[in-house]
Amino acid sequence: MAGSTSASLQTPYFPSSTQINPVRVDHTLPLPPSQPSLSFTQGLLVGQLSVVLLIGAFIKFFIFGEAPPPPSRGLSNRTSTHPRSYSINAASTDSSPRPLREKPSTSNILRPVPSSSTNTRSILRKTYYSATPTHPTPKHGRPRLYHSSHQPESLDWFNVLIAQTIAQYRQTAYILKDSPTSSILASLSETLNNPEKKPSFIDIIKVTDISLGEEFPIFSNCRVIAVEDPNSDGGRLQALMDVDLSDDNLSLAIETSLLLNYPKPFSAVLPVALAVSVVRFSGTLCISFVPGPRTSDQTMSPIPTPHDTTSEAIDDQSSDQPSPAQNPDGPKDAHANTSNTTDASSKHGIPKTSLAFSFLPDYRLDLSVRSLIGSRSRLQDVPKVAQLVEARVQSWFEERVVEPRVQVVGLPNIWPRMGRTGLRSSQEEPEAGSGSVEIPVMTSPGADGVSGGGGSGGGSGGGGGGMRGIDRGLSGREAGYEALRYRHAACGGHQNQSGRDGGRGGNEQFAMPGSMPDTVTET
């Protein structure tokens, strides 16, 4: 009994559903720290080496690396439609570049120009212009015109530039119409009344009306052709373009008298009034570049006549030399200037490129001639007078700018110079109706200065200075219309005065700087 009681006390009773999990105690100790595989010296060396490698890579790729190509302006999406082909001369030149340390002598500083640089076919090939046919047919002893297979161009941009130039000339001529020395009227009067040209039976020619026109010539259908020329390598290139001028009021009116000097001088006087207007002009303009004066003399041999020689000499004197009225010492100064120019050109001996232009013989020039003959009983629009005037104008035009005769003009020096450097203003076009507009106008060195065309804001420059600060006195639109026509009254030599031009002396001559007297019909 006692034994069973002690056994029951020692062994407690637990239900079968209850289980006691034994508690596990982790008796593991922390591991000691691991020793580094590299020493301090080795790590320092590795760090220094990495820094040196980074510096070397920076110097190689950022300092001595090739610069990226500059971005193209507006042409990033465009590709060249013509593959560029390199010539043999260019390849040989580029393959052996000149060392930089080589000291060149004075004879080999400028690299030689290939002999084919001025060849017509070489120029056309490098500019991708096909103007020479595959099998050209020669012609006996005459320059052969090769028809271009290239598409003709419209020349719209060229028409805009020419129109701006002509409009500026018209405006300048109107602004300077009151100048006694630089006016278009003075130039025309001096040319028409030249005693070496004018016959003795014609009295003083007085210009009564000048119209510089309102329209502009239109150029179109431009094409480049190759012309055979024995004096040049591979011929020469010539640009042909159609020009048309119609519905314009370009006109000139004069008054004079026919003198009957038999049996005694001034036995009878017959007043004559003429007005010539250009109704329409159309033709084909030929433009080519002449390499030098020697080549031009050989290529374009003139057919001089006594009349042509005299006319050219007079035209040169009237265009290049001032008149005796403008400069009393004109002959001496003009002769000195001419001799200096000739000496300078002969001293240098450098051939300058010139521009030669002419018209083909198939041009069309329609004129309108109005005449009034007599004092009391007047004859109006006599057909025979119109025929004589038209024939004289046609002859004057053909003797100067119709093939085979050409006009040769020296090209100006376009090398950039600081003396010709200007600054474009922020306001391109002044508003219409503004009070004064500053327009620089170059005057001849012999002029003492001219007054402004507006009347109130005219300035005078001494010693041939420019004229600035011109007060036009008209709005931009009115000045444009008034610039087209201005008259010179026949009686008393005074101008027709209006409210804007009141108080002006009519005997003042007008002229345009750079006017060409040879463009006026000769009588």
From Swiss-Prot:
Residues 70-118, 128-147, 295-349, 420-474, 492-523 are annotated as: Disordered. The chain crosses the membrane at residues 44-64. InterPro entries: Mmm1, MMM1_dom, SMP_LBD. Signal peptide: none annotated. Residues 151-412 form the SMP-LTD domain. One of its GO terms (cellular component) is endoplasmic reticulum membrane. It is found in: Endoplasmic reticulum membrane. Residues 74-96, 105-118, 295-312 have a biased composition (Polar residues). Residues 449-468 have a biased composition (Gly residues). The keyword Cell wall biogenesis/degradation does not apply. Residues 137-147 have a biased composition (Basic residues). It is a single-pass type I membrane protein. PANTHER family: SMP-LTD DOMAIN-CONTAINING PROTEIN, TEX2 PROTEIN-RELATED. This is Maintenance of mitochondrial morphology protein 1. The gene is MMM1.
